[in-house]
Amino acid sequence: MSKIAFTGGGTVGHVSVNLSLIPTATDKGHDAFYIGSKTGIEREMIESQLPNIEYYPISSGKLRRYLSVDNAKDVFKVLKGVIDARKVLKREKPDLLFSKGGFVSVPVVIAARSLNIPTIIHESDLTPGLANKISLKFAKKIYTTFEDTLKYLPKDKADFVGATIRQDLKEGNQSRGYQLTGFDASKKVLLVMGGSLGSKKLNQAIRENLEALLQDYQIIHLTGHGLVDSSIDAKGYVQYEFVKEELTDLLAITDTVVSRAGSNAIYEFLTLRIPMLLIPLGLDQSRGDQIDNAENFESKGYGRTIPEDQLTQVKLLEQLKEIENDRESIIKQMETYRESYTKEDLFNKILKDAL
């Protein structure tokens, strides 16, 4: 049996694949542990959802594509992170490292290379992120969720594996979903997700359109931390900052979703055949990865996209109406998608490629 180190963090998307793979590893008798940041969302998710997995916090700095005084400070944080990670890896002596990306992963990958620990990295977005571009220099292989991502990567290192979906995602219970929300099973449900950090602009657009939206939908609104508006008390509208294990039950009653365009989330909607209206993060807040993801999904007929700078009350209602009119054809397109690798297949491939 092998011992496997996992890393990745900063957003839910940089943790979700690990959350799927770690139980697969331990169920097969392998040992696993996690290296992440001290205060990132990965720590909360791993410690709450996988309490038996040892979590090692390290120093980490943010990687920026623009000039900033903070870049100089963060160089030292990254170097400290390499030292922290190296100490953990020397003590735990894993056989391999699996990295999901995010800024915290870079010092861990560098530390693993310094100890000759083979590393496999995973890229969920259509275009590779900065952390994975750096990590690739020190890794043995990189796996991609989108097949089109291969054109950005060296052929000898890159493999397309598709999306790896949590098994419990498909085990949501409609009865529990309706019980949680108090909704009527005879009326459609719209789920609004602004990403792990929430979206003030998306929240505002939903609330400004609430009266019109509630004519056609009951609404589950995942607002993001600290963004619930307690002054709103409308029948058929519920708000949560963030949900964990309840999400599968809420998705089980969802007819349409309005969401950011992080790849893990949108592949989950695709797997569940939920038509989607995607509002990707703009270039003022990101490198444009969500824009690429959203455009790719729209081109395949899985839903519609509104660029955030074009999000208006009128546009939101228009696009949702289009989705309702085209619901059958959207779901038909979604049904042509087939999962490439199960989590068991992916785990076996990791072992084969790394060891």
From Swiss-Prot:
This is UDP-N-acetylglucosamine--N-acetylmuramyl-(pentapeptide) pyrophosphoryl-undecaprenol N-acetylglucosamine transferase. GO terms for cellular component: plasma membrane. It comes from Staphylococcus haemolyticus (strain JCSC1435). It is a peripheral membrane protein. Transmembrane segments: none annotated. Its EC number is 2.4.1.227. It catalyses: Mur2Ac(oyl-L-Ala-gamma-D-Glu-L-Lys-D-Ala-D-Ala)-di-trans,octa-cis-undecaprenyl diphosphate + UDP-N-acetyl-alpha-D-glucosamine = beta-D-GlcNAc-(1->4)-Mur2Ac(oyl-L-Ala-gamma-D-Glu-L-Lys-D-Ala-D-Ala)-di-trans,octa-cis-undecaprenyl diphosphate + UDP + H(+). InterPro entries: GlcNAc_MurG, Glyco_trans_28_C, GlycoTrans_28_N. Its main location: membrane. It holds the Pfam family Glyco_tran_28_C.
